[in-house]
Amino acid sequence: MDLINSTDYLINASTLVRNSTQFLAPASKMIIALSLYISSIIGTITNGLYLWVLRFKMKQTVNTLLFFHLILSYFISTMILPFMATSQLQDNHWNFGTALCKVFNGTLSLGMFTSVFFLSAIGLDRYLLTLHPVWSQQHRTPRWASSIVLGVWISAAALSIPYLIFRQTHHDRKGKVTCQNNYAVSTNWESKEMQALRQWIHVACFISRFLLGFLLPFFIIIFCYERVASKVKERSLFKSSKPFKVMMTAIISFFVCWMPYHIHQGLLLTMNQSLLLELTLILTVLTTSFNTIFSPTLYLFVGENFKKVFKKSILALFESTFSEDSSVERTQT
């Protein structure tokens, strides 16, 4: 995965390092770096607070368990933002070494896959709870949710391994070090055969990432919530619309925030430096930062009257947001 560094494979020796951010104006680079630093500070504090409340101050339910790990995926993503910002300020020079280069890319991939997988799991959980209440009463337990959580982390880690392997540091002739993908895992950067291999692997990685990390979860979530919405409209199962609003907010925020990333990665395949490529890169950095920082806050405040929110304690707000909907659990199909 590439947010700041867009170099994936090489066309010829004169374009040994192709990085779209080289074309960014200094003001744009400063805005991106400042946004990343601020997002890192805010995200660490807010997401850390949310995790503490969900883990130690609330009863462990399927809801709280799934949302805890969803927010944990966002918290992990905030840990890499300072590295992105520092590299951005140094014109994408990477001075943290090869090991951190690999960890950086692997963590970025892990954060993306886990967040979308947990959003899908939350959608499936709501689908089962609403349309299969009898099965849910018998099987939908924190232990069952723990197995789902374990499966999500294992799947996301497995899908992130290639990006951990392919990521390497590259030294150009001017002494600049970049953290970039070397899909052929070869030190022969100028070989035409290796360039062609890198291109094919890059295309394969893009397609698999787009299908598994975006398109398939999108269809799963759309199916689940279409069925849930139909059932809710038919029987008026929920006491309030808050649970549905919380999940829809999580879904919309994720797809709005990650869509620019996939568009940017698709544009990279065209190998054309353009204003659109530059704009999508800036938008990608800003929206993914927003996703990791503000999405958890939206879960808490959506559907609430702000005057009431500010009068509530943090714990009461969490309990109101993530409480199980008992009316759905009791409904029989």
From Swiss-Prot:
Residues 54-64, 125-143, 231-246, 304-333 are cytoplasmic. GO terms for molecular function: complement receptor activity; G protein-coupled receptor activity. InterPro entries: Formyl_rcpt-rel (IPR000826), GPCR_Rhodpsn (IPR000276), GPCR_Rhodpsn_7TM (IPR017452). The keyword Cell wall biogenesis/degradation does not apply. Keywords: Cell membrane, Disulfide bond, G-protein coupled receptor, Glycoprotein, Membrane, Receptor, Transducer, Transmembrane, Transmembrane helix. GO terms for cellular component: plasma membrane. The chain crosses the membrane at residues 31-53, 65-86, 104-124, 144-165, 210-230, 247-268, 284-303. Glycans are attached at residues 5, 12, 19, 272. One of its GO terms (biological process) is positive regulation of cytosolic calcium ion concentration. It is a multi-pass membrane protein. Residues 1-30, 87-103, 166-209, 269-283 are extracellular. Disulfide bonds join 101-179. The keyword Transmembrane applies. CDD domains: 7tmA_GPR33. It is found in: Cell membrane. Orphan receptor; could be a chemoattractant receptor. Belongs to the G-protein coupled receptor 1 family. This is Probable G-protein coupled receptor 33. It comes from Pan paniscus. The lineage of its organism: Eukaryota, Metazoa, Chordata, Craniata, Vertebrata.
